[in-house]
Amino acid sequence: MNFVVLTLFPLMFPAFAGHGIVRRAVEQGLVDIEALNIRDFAEGRHSTTDDRPYGGGNGMVLKPEPLAKAIRAAKEVHTDARVVFLGPRGRLFDQETAARLAGGKDIIMVCGRYEGIDERIAATLIDEEISIGDYILSGGETAAMVVMDAIIRLIPGALGNESSAEQESFSNQLLEHSHFTRPPVFEGMETPEILLSGDHGKIDQWRTRASLLYTLANRPDLLEGREFSKEEITILENWGRQIADIIRTQGLHGPDALSRNR
C-alpha cells in the first residue's frame, strides 16, 4: 500500500517511517510513505500557500491552487488512490475505519493547517474527511500518523504475528485485558495466580472477563449492537445477579450496609 502525504512539513514524516512496526513494513515492501511539500506547488516569489478567509475572521486558510496541484500530481502517479483529508468535521476514526482503509486502495492524505482548506477543494477533490477526536491540533500531520499507524498494523505481514492484531483492543469491540510480566511480585503487588498456572483455558476465561469489565466500565458504547458469545453472556448474567444482590442488600439494610459488613 502506498501513502502520499500532502503537508507543509514533510520533514516530520521520515522519523515516523523510520521506527518500529512502520519501519519494518516499509523495509519489507508492504508500504511506502512519501511526503510531498504543498509549498512546492505554490506559485510566486514567496510560494504562498495560505490567505485570509473571505468574510473576515481569525486565522488563515490553505489556498486552493497549490493544494489542487499537489493532489492532482499525486493522483497522476496513484490513479486509484483515495484522497483523505484530516479535519475536525470528518467521521470519527475508529478500528472499523482502519480495517476498511487497510483493505482498500492507496491513500493520499491531505494535512490541513491554520483554519483548514478552501471548501472548493473539499467539495471536488476530497473523497473522505476523517477526524481522530474532539480536540484541537496544530495541523493534520500528527493525525495522519495516527491513521497510517492504525492502518499499517492491519496489513498482513506488518506485525509478524497475525494473531496480535486480532487480540488487541477494539479488534472485537472490547478493550484489551490487563498485562503482566516478570517479576511475579513487584513492590508487593502480585501477578494474578491464574496467569502463572499454565492452564490456558482458565487464562482465556480470565482475559475475557477482564476485557468485558474494562469495556463495561470505561467504554460501554463499544458494547452497543455487539454480538456476544455464549461465554460472554454467561459472564454478564453472573455479574447482573451479583449487582442485583448488592442492590437488595442496600435496600434491606440501607446504603451503608456494605461498608459496615466489611
Swiss-Prot record:
Primary enzyme class: transferase
Q: Does the keyword Transferase apply?
A: yes
Query: Which keywords annotate this record?
Result: Cytoplasm, Methyltransferase, S-adenosyl-L-methionine, Transferase, tRNA processing
Where is this gene product found?
Cytoplasm
Q: Does the keyword Nuclease apply?
A: no
- For this UniProt entry, what's an example GO CC term? cytosol
The signal peptide, as residue positions, is none
- InterPro entries linked: Alpha/beta_knot_MTases (IPR029028), tRNA_m1G_MeTrfase_C_sf (IPR023148), tRNA_m1G_MeTrfase_TrmD (IPR002649), tRNA_m1G_MTases_N (IPR029026), tRNA_MeTrfase_TRMD/TRM10 (IPR016009)
Q: Which residues bind S-adenosyl-L-methionine?
A: G112, I132, G133, D134, Y135, I136, L137
One Gene Ontology biological process: tRNA N1-guanine methylation
The chemistry this enzyme catalyses reads: guanosine(37) in tRNA + S-adenosyl-L-methionine = N(1)-methylguanosine(37) in tRNA + S-adenosyl-L-homocysteine + H(+)
Say which domain of life the source belongs to. Answer: Bacteria
Question: What does this chain do?
Answer: Specifically methylates guanosine-37 in various tRNAs.
Say which family it is in: Belongs to the RNA methyltransferase TrmD family.
Official protein name in the record: tRNA (guanine-N(1)-)-methyltransferase
